[in-house]
């Protein structure tokens, strides 16, 4: 089973997405542990994210120590999840190139990564600055989120940056590395793998609301297409991390408000 599953990737681009018969093919071709991971990513992960977001948004104020605890626990959770996914992927015979961890032309990949990261950083920062002066419901929701969850001190910014880097590495490995490799191994074509992995990525971000989930899914289409075209997750890892870093820094700057020292003293911690 180990070697056979890894070899399935060779003919993946020839697969057809043909309704019930194709779904039956997926069910029979994908190992049980991969299905378990897929169900976890599609059901448990979105539920966990929405519940945590609902909890924090219901609070009139979130203390600095609570934000740092949130950042740290999320970092730990993502690395643990990525480690489990990697364990099962390698146990089933998936290779580094199949997972997007090796291959492609380094010069092209580095150039694409640099140009993309620069454009993403500038565009995302400018968009958040533009939204700051708006009373649109999306801007109001972002403002409420920034006041509670975005970094408001140097210590928080360090932890948030580590969280952004973790999300870039772990989420891209899981959704663009493992998920796409698993779908290829089950016989999906490239376009089907792009769509399904992007739907899963969007659903995993339901805690951002319907609009945020849809936008994340659309972004996932771009990221998945780049991963397949260049046989590497490196560009999208960097782009994802840049998006999150800019969201935290620009969001805190244009939407957040500084937590009061008195509130943190009452919480027992002043950073």
Name what the model sees in each region.
Residues 58-60, 69-73, 134-140, 173-174, ...:
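N-terminal start-of-chain detector that recognizes signal peptides
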Residues 38-46, 145-271:
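Transmembrane helix-loop-helix hairpins at the membrane interface
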Residues 50-55, 128-129, 177, 181:
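Short helix-terminus and kink motifs of transmembrane alpha helices
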Residues 21-23, 61-68, 90-167, 185-186, ...:
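Juxtamembrane helix-loop-helix connectors linking adjacent transmembrane helices
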Residues 2-108, 192, 248-271:
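N-terminal, membrane-interfacial amphipathic/helix-forming hydrophobic leader that caps
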Residues 79, 83, 118, 199, ...:
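Hydrophobic alpha-helical transmembrane segments of multipass integral membrane proteins
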